[in-house]
A protein has these predicted regions:
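Bacterial N-terminal signal peptides that target proteins for export
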Residues: 1-10
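N-terminal low-complexity, Pro/Thr/Ser-rich intrinsically disordered segments
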Residues: 30-71
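Short, well-ordered surface patches within globular domains
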Residues: 63-173, 209, 215, 219
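A well-ordered secondary-structure block
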Residues: 140-245
Length: 246
């Protein structure tokens, strides 16, 4: 018997951000995040690669069903999971200097300002290293299905244009014990997507951060589309524990 628990749902709008967060227990959780600022590809601009064992962390680089950016997303999540403190030091802490009140980088009105960045840094510095996420074709197909169909519309959120949920999409391609989904709108690099979800501005439960740092998740899939009618792009990230492709 499947057990579903609906937890707190939050929808917060500001100039450049849209966040929604909810949880389901099968055991399951999923969350969304959007940020329009972006960086270059993590691989194209990774001057600190000497600090990471890229060959170990880049678990998706040789698969043939993900784009370069989609592979970058998995690499960045594995960096964050393998050494949370170092990830915070290199990629999250530097954002602190770019705040003026609640305005980030002279252009983005945030919900919480510098406080949420400090909160994220503190969390990451206390977090224990986690096992790496491995790519899964079925999870990626589920993510790509949602990103491609939603990208052709102005819709946001986890409900598919056909009414599907993250879990029905994942079940279409595989079996799992736990599963989750994150969505980012407007971002154009793997690192930008992952850092924004970890910071989780405006979401009291930090559900997006928890998905990335969930010790139960061992597999991940990514779907990225440049065609969203409102935000320009949409990136869907799926997660699962005890997952197997059908």
């Amino acid at each position: 018997m499947k057990k579903f628990i609906i937890a707190k749902f939050a929808l917060i709008l500001s100039v450049f951000f849209l966040f929604s967060c909810a949880t389901l227990d099968k055991l399951n959780s999923f969350s969304t995040s959007m940020n329009k600022k972006s960086e270059e590809s993590a691989l194209q601009k990774n001057k600190d690669s000497d600090k990471w064992d890229i060959a170990l962390l880049d678990t998706a680089r040789n698969v043939d069903y993900l784009s370069t950016l989609e592979k970058d997303v998995i690499l960045e999540m594995n960096k964050a999971r393998s050494n949370p403190s170092l990830y915070a030091e290199l990629y999250i802490s530097p954002r602190i200097k770019k705040f003026d009140g609640k305005i980030y980088n002279n252009s983005i009105m945030t919900n919480e300002g510098i406080a949420v960045v400090n909160d994220c840094v503190a969390y990451m510095k206390k977090a224990k290293p986690l096992s790496l996420l491995n790519p899964a074709k079925g999870l990626s197909l589920a993510a790509q299905e949602h990103s491609s169909t939603q990208g052709e519309t102005d819709q946001t959120g986890h409900t598919g244009v056909d009414g599907s949920s993250p879990f029905t999409r994942i079940e279409k391609y595989g079996t799992f014990r736990t599963a989750g989904e994150n969505i980012a709108y407007g971002a154009k690099s793997g690192r930008d997507i992952v850092v924004d979800l970890l910071i989780d501005d405006g979401v009291p439960g930090r559900g997006h951060r928890k998905n990335i740092m969930n010790k139960e998740f061992a597999s991940s899939g990514v779907g990225y589309s440049k065609k969203h009618k409102v935000y320009g792009s949409v990136c869907v990230i799926t997660y699962a524990g005890s997952y197997a492709d059908k």
